[in-house]
C-alpha cells in the first residue's frame, strides 16, 4: 500500500499543529527514508507531495501517528495498492489470503460482504457454533473490511489477512455506497442544525466542533454527496411550535481511528491529520470546483 503526504491546505491549518510547512514535511519523511528500510519514500512526480509505500494501512498509520505526535499537521490521500506488470505487460495486483471465523448465524452475511470486496471462497468448515472461512482477496478489497465484518457479525467476527502473491488485476471495485454530508461553510457545528441532519444519516461531528467548507461531517443515508449547513440556527420569532422548547437529543457522533479514516475515504477525498484531530475532507473544498471537476 502507498499514500501521498501533502502539506495541509485546510482553511484552519496551523491552529492545532506547530509544524505545517511543505519543506518541513518533506525533510521529515526523507529522514525516515534513511532510517526505515521497510518503507519506500520518494517525492511525487509533480513535487507536490511525498509518496510513502509500506506493508499495509496499519504499517503506514504507525508513521502518520508518530508524526502527528511530533507536532506535524498535514494531509494524506487514500491508500493505493502498488501494482506490477508481468513479462507480457499484464497488470498485476497484490492478492491476500483472508481467514474469517464467525458465528454460524452470521456466516451468510459475512460471505456476502467478502464477495462484494472481491473475495473468492477457497475453504469453509463449521462446527456447532462457529464457521471458519478462507478467501483469496485483492488487497484493495481489505480496506475497511474489518469494520464491515464486525458490523454484520455484531462484533463477533474475527478477520485476519496476509499477503500471498501478485496476481492478475481483477477489475474495478465498487466504492463506498453512501454519500457524504459535506459542510458548506467554515464555522462551528450547532445542535439545532445537527438535530435536523441526524435524521438524514450518521454524523461525524458534535456541537462546538470546528468545521469548514468541504469537510466531511457525516454520512448520508442515500447515494451521492449532499452539501449541508452545520451552523444553521433556529429562527427566533413570536410564535412557538409545540416542540420548540423540547431539549435536542443528539445521537453520539461516529468516531474514526486513523486507520479507519484512511480506509473510509474515496479517491477524491483526504484525511487531515493534526496533533489533536483526525478529519476527513474533499480534495476540492469548494462545491463549485467539485461540480466543474465532475463535468470534466
Where are these regions (language model features)?
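Accessory interaction regions appended to the cores of large information-processing enzymes
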Residues: 1-296
Amino acid at each position: 500500500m502507498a499514500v501521498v503526504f501533502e502539506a495541509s491546505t485546510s482553511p484552519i491549518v496551523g491552529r492545532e499543529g506547530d509544524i505545517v510547512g511543505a519543506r518541513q514535511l518533506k525533510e521529515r519523511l526523507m529522514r525516515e527514508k534513511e532510517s526505515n528500510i521497510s518503507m519506500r519514500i520518494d517525492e511525487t512526480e509533480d513535487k507536490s507531495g511525498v509518496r510513502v509505500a509500506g506493508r499495509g494501512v496499519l504499517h503506514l498509520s504507525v508513521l502518520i501517528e508518530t508524526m502527528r505526535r511530533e507536532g506535524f499537521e498535514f494531509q494524506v490521500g487514500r491508500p493505493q495498492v502498488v501494482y506490477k506488470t508481468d513479462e507480457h505487460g499484464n497488470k498485476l495486483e497484490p492478492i491476500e489470503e483472508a481467514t474469517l471465523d464467525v458465528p454460524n448465524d452470521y456466516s451468510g452475511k459475512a460471505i456476502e460482504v467478502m464477495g462484494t470486496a472481491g473475495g473468492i471462497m477457497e475453504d469453509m468448515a463449521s462446527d456447532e457454533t462457529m464457521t471458519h472461512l478462507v478467501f483469496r482477496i485483492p488487497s484493495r478489497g481489505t480496506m475497511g473490511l474489518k469494520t464491515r465484518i464486525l458490523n454484520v457479525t455484531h462484533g463477533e467476527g474475527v478477520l485476519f489477512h496476509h499477503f500471498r502473491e501478485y496476481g492478475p488485476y481483477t477489475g474495478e471495485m465498487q466504492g463506498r455506497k453512501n454519500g457524504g454530508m459535506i459542510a458548506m461553510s467554515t464555522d462551528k457545528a450547532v445542535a439545532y442544525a445537527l438535530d435536523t441532519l441526524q435524521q438524514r444519516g450518521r454524523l461525524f461531528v458534535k456541537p462546538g466542533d470546528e468545521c469548514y467548507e468541504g469537510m466531511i461531517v457525516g454520512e448520508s443515508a442515500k447515494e451521492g454527496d449532499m452539501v449541508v449547513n452545520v451552523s444553521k440556527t433556529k429562527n427566533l420569532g413570536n410564535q412557538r411550535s409545540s416542540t420548540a422548547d423540547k431539549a435536542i437529543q443528539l445521537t453520539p457522533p461516529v468516531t474514526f481511528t486513523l486507520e479507519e479514516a484512511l480506509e473510509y475515504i474515496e479517491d477524491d477525498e483526504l484525511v487531515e491529520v493534526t496533533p489533536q484531530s483526525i478529519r476527513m475532507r474533499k480534495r476540492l473544498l469548494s462545491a463549485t470546483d467539485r461540480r466543474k471537476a465532475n463535468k470534466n
